[in-house]
Regions:
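A generic structural signal for short, solvent-exposed coil/turn residues
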Residues: 6-8, 27-29, 37, 47, ...
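Bacterial N-terminal signal peptides
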Residues: 1-5
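Flexible, processing/modification-adjacent segments and terminal tails
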Residues: 7-22, 26-28, 51, 60-91
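Gly/Pro-enriched, hydrophobic low-complexity segments
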Residues: 83-134
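An acidic-aromatic
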Residues: 34-79, 122-125, 130
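N-terminal secretory signal peptides
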Residues: 11-46, 51-59, 101, 115-116
Length: 134
């Protein structure tokens, strides 16, 4: 996620499939949704299935808990291409995750997949499709 977009962009929209594997569960949890980013500080992460839920950060306003808000802000910093914020976001990600692996598309501008490995070994794989940037 920390290298979601290399070039500075004004907006980004994408569909996603998120697969969460938790050691205590036999089957992974699969969710689908849509994400929207608008510069400089708006992010919406909307789950469509299996349960509808929307996480949103708009400037200083947010409808999510502080940990989710930090995660969304890390994504926004990566999308915005803000060097100083990227360094801060990377430091913050080390507190939350054991590793963050990003697979870029052929252009090298947009992430196709992001794999997050939490400190406890649980993993989250996010695959992006239908990406539109401005």
């Amino acid at each position: 996620m920390l290298a979601l977009i290399i070039a500075v962009i004004v907006s980004l929209e994408a569909d996603f499939v998120q697969t969460k594997s938790v050691a205590m569960m036999n089957e992974p949890q699969v969710s689908t949704g849509h994400m929207t980013y608008r510069a400089p500080d708006y992010m919406q992460w909307a789950y469509r299935s299996p349960q509808q839920m929307v996480w949103e950060v708009d400037g200083n306003n947010s409808n999510v808990n502080p940990q989710v808000q930090r995660l969304l802000r890390m994504i926004m910093a990566a999308i915005a291409g803000e060097g100083e914020v990227d360094a801060k976001a990377q430091k913050e990600s080390r507190k939350l995750f054991q590793s963050v692996n990003v697979v870029m598309d052929e252009s090298g501008r947009v992430a196709q997949r992001v794999e997050l490995v939490e400190k406890n070994g649980d993993t989250t794989l996010i695959e992006f499709t239908n990406v539109v940037t401005e």
